[in-house]
Amino acid sequence: MNPYHSYVSELARLVREGRGFPLGGFPIPPRPAIRSNTPPALIFSPHPDDECIIGGLALRLMREAGMRVINVAVTQGSNKARQVARLAELKDACDYLGFELLQTAAQGLENINVKARADGALAWQASVEIIASILAEHRPSVIFFPHDTDWNSTHIGTHYLLVDALARQSPEFACHVVETEFWGAMATPNLMVESSVTDLADMMTALSFHVGEVQRNPYHLLVPAWMQDNVRRGGELVGGQGGAAPDFVFCTLYRLQRWSGGQLQAILKGGRSLPMSVNVATLFAASPGERARE
């Protein structure tokens, strides 16, 4: 018997079965001890659900390093009829993962896109000020936001929203910047972060709390396949063309830099792979003025 036929058949069977799995309502898993007196990580999520998809590194920071993780709901989606429900789903998803949640406005920010930015709309400037205030108040050690070609207009808009908000910080403000990808793949990621089966399963479970979204499109079932494709891409994009691929099954790709002195600065020489066997805290062990090494 051809084993590859069985392999593909099992994948197809699991996806079909997964469509009947419960959505949300799962008991909260054990929580790690959190170091409340240290700067947090902030995830600037363009939409409710992004925190569950690109949050592999953030989840490891919380579970391995005891870091507070705050998910900032940049928008609550474009469908006004769903914004209240999406916030409720987001609260449940964040609670399941152990992330804190911060709203930007009663129903989230609106028109977060490059057109609003180019038009110089007052609403855009007001949105930038909201994000700038969040950065100044929380003084995060790490922030997550999409890269500048992440295809979706709100994802790209969120990138520039953060760029503009960072530019409004005081000269001494510094933090690590982790650019994320989902809709559009990064051409130059420099960080490949492995996720365990447990972490990925918990992220999928949290994603299932976004009931209204996954009912219309069960994309939560395809996150493992996306993470497997990240292993394929990351093996060469991060590890180097023709290099040996890391022994990962699931991973997420990021671009890690540092905001310091009013600008983004490269801190990795080449790329870095972070397996589950290495504590994620080592990734940010360098002092603010020190360039991280592989």
Predicted region positions:
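Active-site beta-strand->loop->alpha-helix modules in alpha/beta enzyme cores, enriched
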Residues: 1-173, 185-186, 205-209, 261, ...
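Sparse, context-dependent recognition of short Cys/His-centered cofactor- or disulfide-binding micro-motifs
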Residues: 26, 128, 143, 178-180, ...
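Flexible domain-boundary/linker segments
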Residues: 58, 107, 160, 179, ...
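Active-site cores that bind ATP or allylic diphosphates and position pyrophosphate for catalysis
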Residues: 171-176, 182-183, 200
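A conserved mid-domain beta-alpha-beta active-site/ligand-binding segment of alpha/beta enzyme cores
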Residues: 184, 189-252
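Acidic, Ser/Thr-rich low-complexity intrinsically disordered segments
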Residues: 245-268
